[in-house]
């Protein structure tokens, strides 16, 4: 991806250097679809944080990721804007994180089928001058599936790759 570093526009303003602090293929795809010119820099920050309400959890993790990447650039380029994001599933009072393996993915999908759960995404946009964090919550219903359907879906590798088993990322709606 080509990145524009403070390239002067016709009106004398300057283009900011936009960085996505995420390795998520889906987030890259979304930013590309809206025509943003950006660089991907993944965060190596410690993401182990204390338990808290899901909306606070995703905002905190998105902030940790964005701030970690911003720190790498803050002294060199004050035109940097960093976007960090984190997504989790929340079901029956529990934050569900990325499945450890196929059996864990099966257990999680089995617990979600036929029920509504919430998907929370927190986003932080930060620069050396300002930070903004917000979250969105979506109710998701997973239909009842046979064990074979679940195992077939898991065999694609999608559930283990995505934090919250979002089949809609690849079109395999559940």
What are these regions (language model features)?
Residues 39-46:
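A short beta-strand-loop structural module common to alpha/beta enzyme folds
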Residues 48-50:
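Generic structural signal for helix capping and beta-alpha/helix-loop junctions
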Residues 16-36:
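N-terminal beta1-alpha1 ligand-phosphate binding loop
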Residues 5-14:
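Short, Lys/Arg-enriched N-terminal segments with co-localized hydrophobic residues
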Residues 16-19, 40, 53-166:
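Anionic-ligand binding patches
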Residues 8, 164-174:
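Residue-level detector of conserved catalytic or cofactor/ligand-binding positions
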């Amino acid at each position: 991806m080509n990145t524009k570093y403070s390239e002067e526009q016709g009106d004398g303003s300057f283009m900011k250097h936009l960085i996505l602090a995420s390795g998520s293929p889906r987030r890259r795809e979304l930013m590309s679809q809206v025509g943003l010119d950006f660089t991907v820099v993944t965060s190596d920050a410690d993401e182990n944080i204390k338990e808290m309400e899901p909306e606070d959890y995703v905002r905190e993790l998105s902030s940790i990721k964005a701030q970690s990447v911003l720190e790498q650039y803050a002294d060199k380029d004050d035109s940097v804007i960093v976007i960090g994001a984190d997504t989790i599933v929340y079901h029956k009072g529990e934050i569900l994180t990325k499945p450890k393996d196929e059996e864990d993915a099966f257990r999680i999908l089995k617990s979600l089928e036929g029920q509504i759960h919430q998907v929370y995404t927190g986003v932080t946009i930060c620069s050396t001058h300002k930070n903004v964090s917000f979250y969105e919550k979506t109710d998701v219903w997973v239909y009842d599936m046979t064990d074979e359907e679940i195992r077939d879906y898991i065999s694609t590798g999608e559930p283990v790759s995505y934090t919250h088993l979002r089949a809609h990322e690849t079109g395999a709606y559940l």
